[in-house]
Amino acid sequence: MCADFPHVELGPDAWTKTIPKSSASSHHFLKAIQLLEQKSVISSQPDIHFGGNTLFEEMARRIRLAFFRDGLNIAEESVLFDIAGQIDLPVQSIAEHMRNGEAMAAMCRDIELGKQYNIEGSPTYILNEGRQKLYGNLGYKIIEANVNEILHRPENQASWC
């Protein structure tokens, strides 16, 4: 399956030898980094050293690689801090945001918003003033058809999608 997607790297240990109990610690860690980005402690600009990713995006990418390619347990904070150190993220600031509850509060807010908007999968697209939801493994043409229908339909007419 992965052979059809050259950007996907799947190692032999993914979901066999290493089975994290939860991905919540990774999300908590990423939320701390996102807060640092919002506060301009770290750059939010794309970086050519990371293939055009921001630091936040690069950390998320490397967490996925650590699990899927390298078979590491991304539920362990030590693994996450090692990855963050590799890209020179301010690990002390990340730890402080996790310790003081700010990252947890932001993560819980995201969970509440997910419930409010009835998010059932990833990715999820909420369209048409909240009346339409697309989620999961959808092809580009389905998403494009729905967006085009909304953009080009005459006023006061129901959408076909």
Regions found by a protein language model. Give the residues of each.
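Structural alpha/beta surface segment adjacent to cysteine/selenocysteine redox centers
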Residues: 1-67
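C-terminal cap of thioredoxin/glutaredoxin-like
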Residues: 47-52, 57-161
